[in-house]
Amino acid sequence: MSSIKIRSKRLKESTQIRILIAHPMEHGNNQDKITHQLIPAHFIRILTVTCNQKVVVSCEMGDSTPKDPYLAFMLKHGKTGDKITVNWLDNLGNIDSEEHIIN
């Protein structure tokens, strides 16, 4: 099951895209409450959003991004039937991807 949830809402001449990613986003400075050992860094490094295979958002995230990041933006000219794809890569080499059709 994907860690990514995508929602879209058509407005007059644009589409609102909302993305929620379930990810720990650990920066590596927190201690485990039981063992008092540092929790290793684990965060999303690169996030890419495409619409019909054309990149519309590409960003580098880091260890200061909070747990379970939420992103929202307006997509000009997004129309019903367009395919939104979200991909991420984290610092441990894990990847995830999810597709969504604008309704």
Walk through the language-model features, giving the residues of each.
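Short, flexible loop/turn segments at beta-strand junctions in immunoglobulin-like
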Residues: 75-77
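Surface beta-strand/loop "capping" patches
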Residues: 1-10
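Short acidic/polar inter-strand loop motif in beta-rich domains
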Residues: 88-98
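Contiguous segments within soluble domain cores/interaction surfaces
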Residues: 5, 14-16, 20-61
